[in-house]
Amino acid sequence: MNRPTAYVGIHADVYGGMTDIGRMIRDAWVFGILPETETCEGWELPKFDTLYGQVHAAWDPYGHMVSQLPADLRARHERIYDTAVKRARELGWSPDLDDDEDE
């Protein structure tokens, strides 16, 4: 079976990017690592290793907790994630879907 080697882009990803890669892209938007117009469509999967390191380093000073973000970043995070959750729900996503993996 041929597996795709390039990412489809956050908007074409499962439920509009409710995946680990989608969350990483949104976090990169929050921290200004990527512009919000960057969907990462066509990125080769290994390129995400570099992005992961950058996003992880950006979260470190805040203990990887939204509540520890300064007000401007917290507001940006809320706006980006609220939009993503709204879109995902329109596409049929439910937070309970993530729990199905444990069953």
Named regions from a protein language model:
Residues 39-92, 96:
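Amphipathic protein-protein interaction modules
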Residues 17, 31, 76, 81, ...:
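A generic signature of intrinsically disordered, low-complexity regions enriched in glycine/proline
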Residues 1-3, 93-103:
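Short intrinsically disordered terminal tails
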Residues 6-50:
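N-terminal acidic leader/helix
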